[in-house]
Amino acid sequence: MGRVYNFSAGPSCLPEEVLKDCADEMLDYKGTGQSVMEMSHRSSAFKPIVEDAEAMVRKLMRVPDNYKIVFLQGGGSTQFAMVPLNLGIRTGKAVYVDTGVWSGKAIKEAKKYVSVDVAASSKDRNFCYIPKIDKITGDYDYAYICLNNTIKGTHWNYIPDTGSIPLVADISSCILSEPLDVSAFGLVFAGAQKNLGPAGVTLVIIRDDLITDSPQKGTPTMLTYKTHTDEDSLYNTPPCYAIYVVGKVLHWIEKNGGAEGMKARNYAKAERLYDYLDSSAVYRATADKDSRSIMNVPFLTKEKDEAKADAINKKFTAEAAKAGLVNLAGHRTVGGMRASIYNAMPIEGVERLIEFMDKFAAENF
């Protein structure tokens, strides 16, 4: 069959141009006679790959000179532990904002290592909005937010003022979807499998003053940021091929206008889909308008009966898949459907989805 439109929350679709480029180099990377998959991470052929990926991150995200960039393993979930282990060393206290499943998991993990205060939460309305916070104050080692919430489809449309408290952000599902002022944060991290590349590599950008050789007692060597910043992501064998693909994606982003180009592309897609949902008599978006994500769009039908709604949702996703629109099922905690429209999703995918939604509505409501 032909290529489908993949609306998965992650791993997600990659630019077709990048996939073809990788395919062309699969058996022979730049005349080396081998695939990057087979290459030693200590070889002269691989070192430029990781250096280029780092340089492209610094260029596209305008990362200041006093920040280090590393490619790690373990996904964003490992960062839930690395952050408190490395940053929670002065007062042993941190402050989090709870905006959904992923910030909730981060809070649960952090409590093993530091005392956690929750500055605000949107749990009261099933995480369908981002709380308004004027300023976060207190004697904390760091403050933590999840900038974009894939499951509930919400996004911070402002950066909270934390004063001198280093701000940490999980930007896994929105990295390079639009410009971001990295200097407003002490540390940001992103699992690659949504907007940067395939699963298996995690990008961390950390300010120099937060890199310590004295993390919490008992912190494993592999969970110490300095271990990796000192060795330029090559302390141990990195996910070589994943980093290689990330580099390709970063060059694709640059070719398509960089972060500003991605912003224009993504807002066009999101506005088209939200406008359709807001004008529909059958479908509705679940996130508050002032908190909506341009990356993840959960939606429900007007069916109120739970059993009937569940049947309708299953029928929708099954028929959508037959039409070449895959991975549209909503998260089990939300139900309904979810369209993840990351950087690589073309506007044509959104148009095809809307056409299908119209047809499905006409036939079932």
Predicted regions and their residues:
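A glycine-/small-polar-enriched, mobile loop at the entrance of the PLP active site in fold-type I
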Residues: R3-E54
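Conserved N-terminal alpha-helix of the aminotransferase class I/II PLP-enzyme fold
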Residues: T32-Q79, G100-V101, E109
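Conserved PLP-binding catalytic core of the aspartate aminotransferase-like
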Residues: Y283-A320
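PLP-dependent aminotransferase-like
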Residues: S77-A143
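Active-site phosphate-binding strand-loop segment of PLP-dependent enzymes
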Residues: G10, A110, S121-I175
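Active-site C-terminal subdomain of aminotransferase-like
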Residues: P15, L187, A192-Y274, D288, ...
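PLP-dependent enzyme catalytic core of the Aspartate aminotransferase-like
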Residues: G2-V4, K322, H331-F365
